């Protein structure tokens, strides 16, 4: 039995993001939640984090099918002088979601406790699949909420993951 059904709400957030991104204009993608973090950078950061954790830390395949073939490399949000288009962001979000879907479909509840290590700032850290999935769900939800609030604050349609998906 896979863990995919447990994460149905995460899928809803992804669907809303995929529905909303293509409708954003270049000017709307430049709206900032905080100085230096326009919507396009937030969406890019969200997508890149999936590759970092799943492909980089957990060694899952698929990074090469995304705009982030080096999971530990520079992300688009690290280059604020190169704004990304709605089309590029949609590709990033959809291609990284395919990695998420693959993991959720293959991983079982028994696999969630498996421990992986990463080195950060010279220190070894231990992470379970469960802890990283929780981190990624919360990370996506936080940044989708950030984008949604920012759009709403500017009088633009926001994203509600709990509206019925048709």
Report residues per predicted region.
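An acidic intrinsically disordered interaction segment
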Residues: 7-15, 106-112
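Acidic/histidine-rich alpha-helical segments that form the ligand environment
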Residues: 76-117, 130-139
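Short, contiguous alpha-helical
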Residues: 7-11, 18, 26-75, 118-166
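Short leucine-rich amphipathic alpha-helices used at interfaces
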Residues: 6-8, 57, 83, 89-90
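Hydrophobic alpha-helical core bundles mediating ligand binding, dimerization, or RNAP-core interactions
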Residues: 10, 14, 21, 93, ...
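N-terminal leader segment of winged-helix/HTH proteins
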Residues: 1-4
């Amino acid at each position: 039995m896979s863990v995919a059904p447990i994460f149905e709400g995460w899928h809803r957030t992804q669907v809303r993001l995929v529905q909303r991104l293509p409708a954003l204009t270049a000017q709307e993608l430049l709206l900032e939640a905080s100085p230096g973090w326009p919507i396009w950078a937030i969406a890019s950061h969200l997508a890149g984090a999936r590759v970092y954790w799943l492909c980089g830390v957990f060694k899952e395949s698929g990074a090469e099918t995304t705009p982030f073939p080096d999971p530990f490399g520079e992300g688009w949000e690290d280059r604020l002088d190169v704004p990304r288009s709605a089309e590029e962001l949609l590709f990033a979000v959809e291609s990284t979601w395919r990695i998420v879907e693959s993991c959720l479909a293959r991983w079982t509840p028994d696999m969630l406790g498996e421990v992986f290590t990463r080195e950060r700032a010279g220190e070894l850290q231990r992470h379970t699949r469960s802890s990283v999935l929780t981190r990624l769900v919360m990370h996506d939800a936080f940044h989708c909420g950030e984008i949604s609030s920012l759009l709403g604050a500017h009088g633009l349609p926001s994203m509600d993951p709990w509206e019925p998906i048709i």
